[in-house]
Amino acid sequence: MTDVSRKIRAWGRRLMIGTAAAVVLPGLVGLAGGAATAGAFSRPGLPVEYLQVPSPSMGRDIKVQFQSGGNNSPAVYLLDGLRAQDDYNGWDINTPAFEWYYQSGLSIVMPVGGQSSFYSDWYSPACGKAGCQTYKWETLLTSELPQWLSANRAVKPTGSAAIGLSMAGSSAMILAAYHPQQFIYAGSLSALLDPSQGMGPSLIGLAMGDAGGYKAADMWGPSSDPAWERNDPTQQIPKLVANNTRLWVYCGNGTPNELGGANIPAEFLENFVRSSNLKFQDAYNAAGGHNAVFNFPPNGTHSWEYWGAQLNAMKGDLQSSLGAG
C-alpha cells in the first residue's frame, strides 16, 4: 500500500469516527446524567432555603437553593449539568450535598435552571423548545447573586468556590479565571476542558440542540469567534496559574466500579472527555501550576455517583482553602 493510500484510509477512519460521534453524542448526553425525577433529596430538618433572587441582567427572579454556613461564611457554588431543571438543582436531586456540608462553615449555593447555558453570558437570547429567555449567568454568579447573598444572608462575597459537573466543570474554571477575587477555588468533574478545539464546538452545538433545542451560535457565536477560546479552560490556564486558583480536577475512564453507573452512555461519555482532562493537566504543569488536585482513577463513569463521591472527598480541601470557620 502506498503512503497516499494509507493517508486516505486514515482520514477516512477519522471522518467515520467523527461522524459517528456527532450523531451519537447528543443522544448519549441525554441519557447520561440526564433529567432526574423531580423531588429534592435534602431531608426535613436541614436549614435549606428556597430563595428568589432578582436578576436585572436576566429580567427575572432566579431560584436558588441555599444553606447557610454562618455569618461571613465563604460560599460553595454547586453548578448543574447540561440538563439542569427548573425545579431543583441536580446536586440536591441526586446527592445529599446539603447533608454532607451541614455545619461545615461553608454556605452552599445551588442556582436552579440554566439548561445548556454553560453558566455564560450569551450573545443572543437563548431560544429553545420552551421559548426564548435571556441568559446572563456569568453576570448573575459574579455580581448579582454574591451581592444579594452578602446583603441578605451575610455570606462572604469573595473567596468562594465554584464546583461543576460535565458542562459546568468548564464553567467553574472560567468563572475562576476571570473573577479571581470571588472564586479562589474551582472544581471540575468530568468536563470537556478544551471545548474550542477540534470538533468541540460542533459536538457542543449538537448536545445543546438535544438538551432543550438551544443553539451554540446564540451563546458564543461561530466556532471562529474569540468567545470560544475565552470560555476554554485549557486556553485560560495562564490566568488560573497567575491567579494561583486552587483546582480540583476529576475524570474517570468509563469503567464502572462498585459505585455504579454501568451503562453505555455514561461509560462512553466519561471515556470521551478524559483525554481533554489529561491534556489540561500536562498544559497546567508546563505552565508552572502547582495548586491543583488531579484525580484520574482507572474507573468511573459519567454519572452522579462519582460526582457526589468527589464532592464529599473535597470537603476538607474546600474548608482549608476557603478558610471555613
UniProtKB/Swiss-Prot annotation:
Catalytic residue list: 166 (nucleophile), 270, 302
Residue numbers binding substrate: 82-83, 166, 194, 272-275, 279, 302-304
Catalytic reaction list: 2 alpha,alpha'-trehalose 6-mycolate = alpha,alpha'-trehalose 6,6'-bismycolate + alpha,alpha-trehalose; an acyl-CoA + a 1,2-diacyl-sn-glycerol = a triacyl-sn-glycerol + CoA
One Gene Ontology term, aspect cellular component: extracellular region
Signal sequence coordinates: 1-40
A Pfam family assignment: Esterase
Disulfide bridges in this chain: 127-132
Location in the cell: Secreted
EC number of the protein: 2.3.1.122, 2.3.1.20
Gene Ontology MF terms: diacylglycerol O-acyltransferase activity; trehalose O-mycolyltransferase activity
Stretches the record annotates as Fibronectin-binding: 98-108
Classification via InterPro entries: AB_hydrolase_fold, Esterase-like, Mycobacterial_A85_antigen
Keywords (A to Z) from UniProt: Acyltransferase, Disulfide bond, Secreted, Signal, Transferase
Function: The antigen 85 proteins (FbpA, FbpB, FbpC) are responsible for the high affinity of mycobacteria for fibronectin, a large adhesive glycoprotein, which facilitates the attachment of Mycobacteria to murine alveolar macrophages (AMs). They also help to maintain the integrity of the cell wall by catalyzing the transfer of mycolic acids to cell wall arabinogalactan and through the synthesis of alpha,alpha-trehalose dimycolate (TDM, cord factor).
Protein family (similarity comment): Belongs to the mycobacterial A85 antigen family.
Protein name in the entry: Diacylglycerol acyltransferase/mycolyltransferase Ag85B
